[in-house]
């Protein structure tokens, strides 16, 4: 990083991805360069990767300049899903009525690279129908963490998951 270049302000492949907006104005945000390369090789060219950092507010604000519907599709392993959860917690406060962020959750031991190489472009494109809005992603994660049969658990967990809304 330098004074002029900050990883948290850019994406790998953004210049190329801007040329390939699809009819839904989607862009896939993936974790790694190899994910971008594999998806691109199979014809999915509206894809970028964060540059070895957690997804930042500045990166999403940059993406929104070019795409209305970013889809965060991190690896299906535990670390990838933890990174997705951290991204959701970080990005939800900057949401407004005109912004969208979707999440696409891969199964355990899959990443975009392995998924498309194993199942192909048509399957990946169809799988994109499973994307969910950031708010639903956060609720799903929350309910995976709590014991819904234990009201005390719900109360304690709720205190840890209050998300501020911008007015």
Task: Please state what every model-predicted region is.
Residues 62, 90-98:
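Arginine/glycine-rich "motif VI" loop of SF2 helicases in the C-terminal RecA-like domain
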Residues 1-66, 83-84:
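Phosphate-handling DNA/RNA-contact segment within nucleic-acid enzymes
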Residues 45, 68, 99-101:
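A structural micro-motif
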Residues 43-47, 87-91, 118-122:
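Short secondary-structure boundary/capping segments
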Residues 27-29, 67-79, 84, 104-105:
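Acidic beta-strand-to-loop metal/phosphate-binding motif
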Residues 34-35, 53-55, 77-79, 107-111:
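Conserved nucleotide-binding/hydrolysis micro-motifs of P-loop NTPases
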Residues 98-167:
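C-terminal or mid-to-C-terminal helical accessory/interaction module adjacent to the motor/catalytic core
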